[in-house]
Amino acid sequence: MHLRILIVICISVSSLTANDYFIRTWEKHHLNPHFWAEGGHAADFNRDGHGDVVVGPYWYAGPNFKKRHTLYSDKDTFEIKKAGKKEKLPGFPGELSRRNGYSNNFLTYTYDFNGDEWPDVLVFGWPGKNTTWYENPQNKPGLWPEHHIFQTSNGESPRPIDMNSDGKPELLLHSGGHLGYVQGDWNAPSKPWKFIRISAKGSWQRYTHGYGAGDVNGDGRVDILAKEGWWEQPAELDGKDWKHHPVQFSKGRGGAQMYAYDVDGDGDNDVITSLDGHGYGLVWFENLGKTESGSFNFKQHIIINREPSESPYGVKFTQIHAIDLVDINGDGLLDILTGKRFWAHGPGKDFEPSAPAVLYWFELTRTPKGVHYIPHLIDDNSGVGTQVAGVDINGDGHTDVVVGNKKGAFAFIQKAKKTTKAQWQLARPKRVKN
């Protein structure tokens, strides 16, 4: 197994209080150079007190991630020509093949599905195909038992989220041209889950971009977001379609995971999204309040876009195909974790496919002059897949990052070092325009 560890020299700086200043570096673990999945996650799978990382068919045992374990079949291979001879490589065509390919694992999450206190692994496979959870065998040898719970999970940004406030996750996805989510029977979580339709039939299909959820109108219920607007969850779930509030959250194909979050701290939730998962644009839509018709007005704010001049820090990159909303610096505000999906459609398609595969976190900052996001570069040779996960892998209280994509599998461990205000100011990202 190939494993590389290095300290990433990209520096993030943040202050938690007037007297606390931190410089943040990232310990980069290149767990595997082979392409197995477009996402990954973390949990303590062997319950030894150390967080582990899962990407594709493998989980890597913490704290050093050197020992690899297989949870489902890793027999997929492909051929390349090297020095005039054919060579067989594990996984799927990606960076090592110098040609494009796709995996059978689009997103990965962890959760204890059967309540035995051992974390299991949830895999959204190829869009439109099976969603499966793999049952942790409690340190017993062999592949993990698999449970296929839904056959046609459409969309490129599904994820688990508690839709009905019962403390357990539903699976946010769409199917058969309808928006909705999938609900399980927690007395029998390995049996097929049921799709809960919330919209009339539309043009949504397996490769639709941009999908999310959150409480948009502040009524305490989780609404559903798509690039065409948001669907209001009613007080009673009676099987009828949810009310659609049209908002153009993307003029193009749509982006990645979408979130409702109070960005500006004014008490109502705004919307965070990318504009095009294969193009440009990371934005937040300010919730301007309720209209006479009962809907809400939104104002778009650009974080980064097509031109460096559209960012106060001169940052731009393409293919924002994965977003996580997580508190990176421990200040209580949720930051944006994202980056460039490496070779979404290979080396010859999309915008700037061969530009550096960057991984960033955007620090949410509220000031008397308003809200802005400060970009902090984590790495410039990894990027994201269709998923990026911010999770405290090693339990030190700092958010770490897991990536799976066509460059392989990565874990980034955050290192926060207390410093002086002068050093903090010197290291802080500099604005190129006011």
Could you say what each language-model-derived stretch is?
Residues 18-434:
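Beta-propeller-forming repeat regions
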